[in-house]
């Protein structure tokens, strides 16, 4: 489990990206790179890190399910992910 401060920081950063998204798009289309550089650093979507939606783990993130491999395994064993079952052959 990630530190609560990291999870909170990630949430705040995503909100900032959403707030400035339209303004960034307009500045990029206009080619106003000076204006882009005046925006906050955290307004750039490139700085976001994919994190597990349940416990905030930043590594081994599975984009399709939005969780880390560890959480995915636990949820799959419990049968809480539709269409996923243990392989058997």
Curated annotation (Swiss-Prot):
InterPro entries: Ribosomal_uS14, Ribosomal_uS14_bac/plastid, Ribosomal_uS14_sf. It comes from the Bacteria. One of its GO terms (biological process) is translation. Binds 16S rRNA, required for the assembly of 30S particles and may also be responsible for determining the conformation of the 16S rRNA at the A site. One of its GO terms (cellular component) is cytoplasm. GO terms for molecular function: rRNA binding; structural constituent of ribosome. Part of the 30S ribosomal subunit. Contacts proteins S3 and S10. It holds the Pfam family Ribosomal_S14. Keywords: Ribonucleoprotein, Ribosomal protein, RNA-binding, rRNA-binding. Belongs to the universal ribosomal protein uS14 family. This is Small ribosomal subunit protein uS14.
């Amino acid at each position: 489990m990630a530190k609560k401060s990291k999870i909170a920081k990630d949430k705040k950063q995503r909100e900032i990206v959403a707030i400035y998204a339209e303004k960034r798009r307009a500045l990029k289309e206009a080619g106003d790179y000076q204006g882009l550089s005046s925006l906050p650093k955290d307004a750039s979507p490139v700085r976001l890190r994919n994190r597990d939606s349940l416990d905030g783990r930043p590594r081994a993130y599975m984009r399709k399910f939005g969780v880390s491999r560890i959480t995915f395994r636990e949820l799959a064993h419990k049968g809480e992910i539709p269409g996923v079952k243990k392989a058997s052959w």
